[in-house]
Amino acid sequence: MFTRTKLKFVASIFIIAIYLMVPVFAYDTEPSRASKQIMSYSMDVKSTGNGRIAIIFSVDGTGKMEHIGAERITVYQQVNGIWVYANSIDQNGSGMSANNTYYYGNTIYYNGISGEEYRVEVTIFAEDASGSDSRPKTFYEKA
């Protein structure tokens, strides 16, 4: 059978194997964020009926931002298979951005033609003393 020494050796190996099976999770000292200025963001485009399109965005800065919000929204309409410029609004337009705040979000509405296909390009941004950053996204929506 087993001698006392062999039994201790097998038990030690078994204990070491158990310790090796315990999961170890890495710890990151840096918080997860999109950039130095943008902590998180979201963008979406939805048809609300009767040709109206809701363009929804929000931006959460990593701190108090000098300027934060949507940098640009550009809308194209599909005409005979070709994307044709329909309208755009920049960061200085009504409801697009805010100054000296941590967060900004809003919904901008575009009045299109019911049943038509639209391409909407949305770019969010955040700007502070150390610089600025932006994130674009393109959506396709039937009004």
Language-model region placement:
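Sec-dependent N-terminal signal peptides of Gram-positive bacterial secreted proteins and lipoproteins
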Residues: 2-26
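Low-complexity, Ser/Thr/Pro-rich intrinsically disordered linker/stalk segments at domain junctions
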Residues: 25-143
